[in-house]
Regions:
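Mobile cap/lid helix-loop segments that gate and shape the active-site cleft of serine hydrolases
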Residues: 35-40, 185-215, 221
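Conserved alpha/beta-hydrolase "acid-adjacent" motif
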Residues: 232-238
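Short beta-strand element of the alpha/beta-hydrolase
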Residues: 69-80
Length: 295
Protein backbone atom coordinates (compact mmCIF):
# COMPACT_ATOMS: atom_id res chain seq x y z
CA UNK A 1 0.00 0.00 0.00
CA UNK A 2 2.87 2.36 0.85
CA UNK A 3 4.43 1.73 -2.56
CA UNK A 4 1.12 2.42 -4.31
CA UNK A 5 0.70 5.67 -2.37
CA UNK A 6 4.23 6.72 -3.32
CA UNK A 7 3.59 6.02 -7.00
CA UNK A 8 0.30 7.93 -6.98
CA UNK A 9 1.91 10.85 -5.17
CA UNK A 10 4.73 10.93 -7.70
CA UNK A 11 2.24 10.99 -10.57
CA UNK A 12 0.29 13.84 -8.95
CA UNK A 13 3.49 15.84 -8.43
CA UNK A 14 4.57 15.21 -12.02
CA UNK A 15 1.20 16.31 -13.37
CA UNK A 16 1.28 19.45 -11.23
CA UNK A 17 4.77 20.30 -12.49
CA UNK A 18 3.63 19.59 -16.05
CA UNK A 19 0.75 22.06 -15.82
CA UNK A 20 2.92 24.73 -14.17
CA UNK A 21 6.02 24.49 -16.35
CA UNK A 22 4.52 23.81 -19.78
CA UNK A 23 2.39 26.38 -21.62
CA UNK A 24 -1.22 25.14 -22.04
CA UNK A 25 -1.11 24.82 -25.85
CA UNK A 26 2.14 22.89 -25.61
CA UNK A 27 0.51 20.57 -23.08
CA UNK A 28 -1.87 19.60 -25.88
CA UNK A 29 1.12 19.07 -28.15
CA UNK A 30 2.73 16.69 -25.68
CA UNK A 31 -0.48 14.78 -24.92
CA UNK A 32 -1.23 14.50 -28.63
CA UNK A 33 2.21 12.99 -29.22
CA UNK A 34 1.89 10.55 -26.32
CA UNK A 35 -1.41 9.31 -27.76
CA UNK A 36 0.14 8.98 -31.23
CA UNK A 37 -2.37 11.53 -32.47
CA UNK A 38 -2.69 11.97 -36.23
CA UNK A 39 0.35 9.81 -37.00
CA UNK A 40 -0.54 9.90 -40.71
CA UNK A 41 0.80 13.47 -40.87
CA UNK A 42 4.17 15.05 -40.12
CA UNK A 43 6.04 18.33 -40.12
CA UNK A 44 7.87 18.65 -43.43
CA UNK A 45 9.52 22.04 -42.89
CA UNK A 46 10.48 23.88 -39.70
CA UNK A 47 11.56 27.46 -39.11
CA UNK A 48 11.23 28.63 -42.70
CA UNK A 49 11.84 32.39 -42.88
CA UNK A 50 9.02 34.22 -44.64
CA UNK A 51 9.88 37.76 -43.52
CA UNK A 52 13.62 38.27 -43.15
CA UNK A 53 13.33 41.91 -42.06
CA UNK A 54 11.27 40.98 -38.99
CA UNK A 55 12.64 37.48 -38.42
CA UNK A 56 9.28 35.79 -38.96
CA UNK A 57 9.25 32.02 -39.48
CA UNK A 58 6.73 29.29 -40.23
CA UNK A 59 6.35 25.51 -40.15
CA UNK A 60 4.71 23.27 -42.75
CA UNK A 61 2.75 20.08 -42.05
CA UNK A 62 1.52 17.56 -44.62
CA UNK A 63 0.13 14.03 -44.94
CA UNK A 64 2.85 11.38 -45.00
CA UNK A 65 1.25 9.67 -47.97
CA UNK A 66 0.65 12.06 -50.86
CA UNK A 67 -0.48 11.15 -54.36
CA UNK A 68 0.23 13.00 -57.57
CA UNK A 69 -2.58 15.50 -57.05
CA UNK A 70 -1.81 18.75 -55.30
CA UNK A 71 -3.46 19.19 -51.91
CA UNK A 72 -5.61 21.98 -50.49
CA UNK A 73 -3.74 24.41 -48.28
CA UNK A 74 -4.60 25.79 -44.84
CA UNK A 75 -2.81 28.74 -43.27
CA UNK A 76 -3.56 28.58 -39.54
CA UNK A 77 -3.01 31.49 -37.14
CA UNK A 78 -2.80 30.58 -33.45
CA UNK A 79 -4.22 32.73 -30.66
CA UNK A 80 -2.84 34.38 -27.56
CA UNK A 81 -4.47 37.77 -27.14
CA UNK A 82 -2.07 39.44 -29.59
CA UNK A 83 0.70 39.23 -27.00
CA UNK A 84 1.47 35.51 -26.49
CA UNK A 85 1.82 32.25 -28.40
CA UNK A 86 4.28 30.58 -30.73
CA UNK A 87 3.90 28.20 -33.62
CA UNK A 88 5.91 25.42 -31.95
CA UNK A 89 3.14 25.00 -29.37
CA UNK A 90 0.48 24.33 -31.99
CA UNK A 91 1.94 21.37 -33.82
CA UNK A 92 -1.12 19.35 -32.79
CA UNK A 93 -3.23 21.68 -34.96
CA UNK A 94 -0.90 21.29 -37.93
CA UNK A 95 -0.95 17.51 -37.61
CA UNK A 96 -4.72 17.36 -37.17
CA UNK A 97 -5.53 19.27 -40.35
CA UNK A 98 -2.72 17.63 -42.32
CA UNK A 99 -4.23 14.26 -41.39
CA UNK A 100 -7.45 15.57 -42.97
CA UNK A 101 -5.65 16.08 -46.27
CA UNK A 102 -4.27 19.63 -46.07
CA UNK A 103 -0.83 21.08 -46.47
CA UNK A 104 -0.83 23.23 -43.32
CA UNK A 105 1.25 26.37 -42.92
CA UNK A 106 1.68 27.64 -39.35
CA UNK A 107 3.30 31.10 -39.19
CA UNK A 108 4.42 33.19 -36.26
CA UNK A 109 3.58 36.90 -36.10
CA UNK A 110 4.79 39.86 -34.05
CA UNK A 111 2.96 40.70 -30.85
CA UNK A 112 2.28 43.35 -28.24
CA UNK A 113 4.22 45.14 -26.75
CA UNK A 114 6.78 44.96 -29.56
CA UNK A 115 4.14 45.99 -32.09
CA UNK A 116 0.49 46.99 -32.16
CA UNK A 117 -2.28 47.03 -34.75
CA UNK A 118 -1.97 46.60 -37.71
CA UNK A 119 1.49 44.98 -37.70
CA UNK A 120 0.33 41.46 -36.78
CA UNK A 121 -2.10 41.58 -39.71
CA UNK A 122 0.75 42.58 -42.02
CA UNK A 123 2.79 39.62 -40.78
CA UNK A 124 -0.13 37.33 -41.54
CA UNK A 125 -0.40 38.78 -45.04
CA UNK A 126 3.31 38.21 -45.62
CA UNK A 127 2.86 34.58 -44.62
CA UNK A 128 0.07 34.21 -47.19
CA UNK A 129 2.36 35.78 -49.81
CA UNK A 130 4.96 33.14 -48.96
CA UNK A 131 2.31 30.48 -49.50
CA UNK A 132 1.46 31.96 -52.88
CA UNK A 133 5.09 31.75 -53.95
CA UNK A 134 6.22 28.52 -52.31
CA UNK A 135 3.48 26.09 -51.30
CA UNK A 136 3.69 24.03 -54.50
CA UNK A 137 7.14 22.86 -53.36
CA UNK A 138 5.40 21.06 -50.51
CA UNK A 139 2.62 19.52 -52.58
CA UNK A 140 0.09 22.27 -51.96
CA UNK A 141 -2.27 23.70 -54.56
CA UNK A 142 -1.98 27.53 -54.71
CA UNK A 143 -5.47 27.61 -56.22
CA UNK A 144 -6.98 26.00 -53.10
CA UNK A 145 -5.69 28.15 -50.24
CA UNK A 146 -7.81 28.62 -47.11
CA UNK A 147 -7.32 30.44 -43.80
CA UNK A 148 -8.27 29.66 -40.22
CA UNK A 149 -7.35 30.80 -36.74
CA UNK A 150 -8.30 30.65 -33.09
CA UNK A 151 -8.99 33.69 -30.91
CA UNK A 152 -6.52 36.46 -31.89
CA UNK A 153 -5.51 34.20 -34.76
CA UNK A 154 -9.13 34.06 -35.86
CA UNK A 155 -9.10 37.85 -35.85
CA UNK A 156 -6.05 37.90 -38.13
CA UNK A 157 -7.56 35.33 -40.50
CA UNK A 158 -10.79 37.33 -40.72
CA UNK A 159 -9.06 40.66 -41.29
CA UNK A 160 -6.97 39.19 -44.10
CA UNK A 161 -10.12 37.72 -45.64
CA UNK A 162 -12.31 40.81 -45.45
CA UNK A 163 -10.06 43.89 -45.52
CA UNK A 164 -8.51 43.75 -48.98
CA UNK A 165 -5.61 46.08 -48.20
CA UNK A 166 -3.47 43.56 -46.33
CA UNK A 167 -3.14 40.85 -48.97
CA UNK A 168 -3.06 43.44 -51.76
CA UNK A 169 -0.17 45.31 -50.15
CA UNK A 170 1.70 42.03 -49.62
CA UNK A 171 1.43 41.23 -53.33
CA UNK A 172 -1.14 38.45 -53.06
CA UNK A 173 -3.35 38.10 -56.13
CA UNK A 174 -7.07 38.96 -55.75
CA UNK A 175 -9.29 36.00 -54.86
CA UNK A 176 -6.38 33.94 -53.55
CA UNK A 177 -8.16 32.93 -50.32
CA UNK A 178 -10.91 30.43 -51.10
CA UNK A 179 -12.53 30.09 -47.66
CA UNK A 180 -11.97 31.02 -44.02
CA UNK A 181 -12.88 29.58 -40.62
CA UNK A 182 -12.75 31.64 -37.44
CA UNK A 183 -12.66 29.77 -34.13
CA UNK A 184 -13.72 31.93 -31.18
CA UNK A 185 -12.39 35.05 -32.86
CA UNK A 186 -13.16 38.67 -31.90
CA UNK A 187 -14.83 40.40 -34.84
CA UNK A 188 -16.94 43.16 -33.27
CA UNK A 189 -15.44 44.30 -29.97
CA UNK A 190 -15.80 48.06 -29.65
CA UNK A 191 -15.35 49.77 -27.30
CA UNK A 192 -12.00 48.36 -26.21
CA UNK A 193 -12.71 47.16 -22.69
CA UNK A 194 -9.97 44.66 -21.88
CA UNK A 195 -6.28 45.17 -21.18
CA UNK A 196 -5.36 43.06 -24.19
CA UNK A 197 -7.54 44.89 -26.70
CA UNK A 198 -6.58 48.29 -25.29
CA UNK A 199 -2.87 47.51 -25.53
CA UNK A 200 -3.19 46.14 -29.05
CA UNK A 201 -5.48 48.77 -30.59
CA UNK A 202 -5.89 51.91 -28.47
CA UNK A 203 -3.41 54.00 -30.43
CA UNK A 204 -5.21 53.60 -33.77
CA UNK A 205 -6.97 56.89 -34.65
CA UNK A 206 -10.03 55.24 -36.23
CA UNK A 207 -11.10 52.32 -34.02
CA UNK A 208 -13.70 51.09 -36.53
CA UNK A 209 -10.83 50.21 -38.88
CA UNK A 210 -9.69 47.57 -36.40
CA UNK A 211 -12.98 45.65 -36.56
CA UNK A 212 -13.41 42.73 -38.98
CA UNK A 213 -17.18 43.22 -39.09
CA UNK A 214 -16.65 46.69 -40.59
CA UNK A 215 -15.22 45.04 -43.71
CA UNK A 216 -17.91 42.40 -44.22
CA UNK A 217 -18.85 42.33 -47.90
CA UNK A 218 -21.12 40.50 -50.29
CA UNK A 219 -18.26 39.14 -52.38
CA UNK A 220 -16.31 37.69 -49.46
CA UNK A 221 -15.19 34.08 -49.83
CA UNK A 222 -17.22 31.51 -47.86
CA UNK A 223 -16.78 32.04 -44.13
CA UNK A 224 -17.54 29.81 -41.16
CA UNK A 225 -17.58 31.21 -37.61
CA UNK A 226 -17.44 28.81 -34.68
CA UNK A 227 -17.91 29.56 -31.00
CA UNK A 228 -18.65 27.88 -27.69
CA UNK A 229 -21.77 28.80 -25.77
CA UNK A 230 -19.71 29.11 -22.57
CA UNK A 231 -16.93 31.27 -24.01
CA UNK A 232 -16.35 34.07 -21.49
CA UNK A 233 -13.14 35.28 -23.15
CA UNK A 234 -14.46 36.14 -26.61
CA UNK A 235 -18.21 36.33 -26.28
CA UNK A 236 -20.33 34.30 -28.73
CA UNK A 237 -21.95 37.56 -29.88
CA UNK A 238 -18.83 38.15 -32.02
CA UNK A 239 -19.57 35.10 -34.16
CA UNK A 240 -23.32 35.70 -34.11
CA UNK A 241 -23.03 39.28 -35.33
CA UNK A 242 -20.42 38.45 -37.96
CA UNK A 243 -22.54 35.66 -39.45
CA UNK A 244 -25.63 37.86 -39.36
CA UNK A 245 -23.88 40.74 -41.10
CA UNK A 246 -22.48 38.51 -43.83
CA UNK A 247 -25.93 37.00 -44.41
CA UNK A 248 -27.48 40.47 -44.62
CA UNK A 249 -25.00 41.37 -47.35
CA UNK A 250 -25.65 38.16 -49.28
CA UNK A 251 -22.31 36.49 -48.55
CA UNK A 252 -21.97 32.76 -47.86
CA UNK A 253 -21.56 32.28 -44.12
CA UNK A 254 -22.06 29.44 -41.67
CA UNK A 255 -22.37 29.71 -37.90
CA UNK A 256 -22.12 27.04 -35.25
CA UNK A 257 -22.13 27.26 -31.45
CA UNK A 258 -20.94 24.19 -29.53
CA UNK A 259 -22.96 23.61 -26.35
CA UNK A 260 -21.06 24.14 -23.10
CA UNK A 261 -17.68 24.66 -24.78
CA UNK A 262 -15.42 27.42 -23.45
CA UNK A 263 -12.84 29.52 -25.27
CA UNK A 264 -10.10 27.02 -24.52
CA UNK A 265 -12.32 24.02 -25.29
CA UNK A 266 -12.65 25.08 -28.92
CA UNK A 267 -8.93 24.71 -29.60
CA UNK A 268 -8.59 21.70 -27.27
CA UNK A 269 -11.19 19.86 -29.36
CA UNK A 270 -8.72 19.80 -32.26
CA UNK A 271 -6.26 17.74 -30.20
CA UNK A 272 -6.87 14.00 -30.36
CA UNK A 273 -7.25 13.45 -26.58
CA UNK A 274 -10.11 15.96 -26.42
CA UNK A 275 -12.05 15.50 -29.64
CA UNK A 276 -15.02 14.19 -27.72
CA UNK A 277 -15.62 17.79 -26.61
CA UNK A 278 -17.04 18.69 -30.01
CA UNK A 279 -16.78 18.18 -33.76
CA UNK A 280 -14.70 21.32 -34.29
CA UNK A 281 -12.03 19.61 -36.40
CA UNK A 282 -14.45 17.69 -38.61
CA UNK A 283 -16.77 20.65 -39.14
CA UNK A 284 -14.03 23.12 -40.01
CA UNK A 285 -12.04 20.71 -42.19
CA UNK A 286 -15.11 19.72 -44.19
CA UNK A 287 -16.11 23.35 -44.76
CA UNK A 288 -12.62 24.29 -45.92
CA UNK A 289 -12.20 21.24 -48.14
CA UNK A 290 -15.53 21.73 -49.87
CA UNK A 291 -15.09 25.45 -50.45
CA UNK A 292 -11.47 25.21 -51.54
CA UNK A 293 -12.84 23.56 -54.69
CA UNK A 294 -15.24 26.37 -55.61
CA UNK A 295 -14.87 28.10 -58.97
Amino acid sequence: MKILFTVVAAIVVALFAFTKLVAPPNQLNILNTLMLGDSSASRVAEGVVFDKANGMKLDVWAPKQKGAAKLPVLVFFYGGGWYAGERAHYGFVGKAYAAKGFVVVMPDYRKVPKVRFPEFNKDGANAVRWVQDNVEKFGGDPKRVTLAGHSAGGYIAMMLTLDRQYLRDAGVVPGFVRATVGLAGPYDFLPFDSVRSINAFYQWPKPIETQPIAFARADAPPIMVLTGTHDDTVKPRNAILMARRLHELGAQAEFKAYPYLTHEDLIMAISKPFRSKGTVLDDSAMFLLENSRRN
